[in-house]
Curated annotation (Swiss-Prot):
It comes from Mycobacterium tuberculosis (strain ATCC 25618 / H37Rv). The keyword Chaperone does not apply. It comes from the Bacteria. Pathway: Cofactor biosynthesis; coenzyme A biosynthesis; CoA from (R)-pantothenate: step 1/5. It is found in: Cytoplasm. This is Pantothenate kinase. Its EC number is 2.7.1.33. GO terms for cellular component: cytoplasm; plasma membrane. InterPro entries: P-loop_NTPase, PanK, PRK/URK. ATP binds at residues 97-104. Was identified as a high-confidence drug target. GO terms for biological process: coenzyme A biosynthetic process. GO terms for molecular function: ATP binding; pantothenate kinase activity.
Amino acid sequence: MSRLSEPSPYVEFDRRQWRALRMSTPLALTEEELVGLRGLGEQIDLLEVEEVYLPLARLIHLQVAARQRLFAATAEFLGEPQQNPDRPVPFIIGVAGSVAVGKSTTARVLQALLARWDHHPRVDLVTTDGFLYPNAELQRRNLMHRKGFPESYNRRALMRFVTSVKSGSDYACAPVYSHLHYDIIPGAEQVVRHPDILILEGLNVLQTGPTLMVSDLFDFSLYVDARIEDIEQWYVSRFLAMRTTAFADPESHFHHYAAFSDSQAVVAAREIWRTINRPNLVENILPTRPRATLVLRKDADHSINRLRLRKL
């Protein structure tokens, strides 16, 4: 554990230091289960789960308990009835990072681990993809080329959804996005019913603004980080691999890429990265990194070897 020479709100860890904070937290995840959680191109193994994610799960578990005590103290001050132990105030976790950095895998692994704690078994995961405007609306607004940028999301709907969950509504509904069809599925909904923990994963979830933003409702937040050059290479590699997986489906919006040669696919992927994903990362996503409670830093081989925890 290292503290910067200048006063800082952060504490930095290497993996050896971080894994010592696991204490006796048990590993309740099998290799078979991990395979189902691992994203395309991700290299996460059970050792990384033990050394990185179990200490993280322990930290969040402690913070969930502390947050509930804080809510109880506020209720006592206001003279309100104590909350029903079967319906605690949901703990909201934000997971942010670039396209292709592995934030979806991080969110899924975290969900699986947190749901195994007796005190918070109901853990829901929602991605902000469902809050993108439908393609027809993006076309009307001339925003198709900005898909994934902050302005391409229905931020009011996202705010209403998270506020509804946080305020203890019986249920809240999130739209569903199809990566196959590259659009919102009309009429489809993901129903969230008073979870103990809600994980919200997306590119721009740590965005701030002059008014109340969804990040203001987070109790804990993660930023999955890596060198921009490494993320670009991961994106290109994933694009190449998808020619024989997602793109191979005739129903896929990107089916035409399935017939591309390696060289054609590399050119196409790098152009998408250069014109869309990199600008969004540099202009909108990366500037939100300082807001994260914990930054997970990946090396070129996808492994997490450095972490930065916000202590203030």
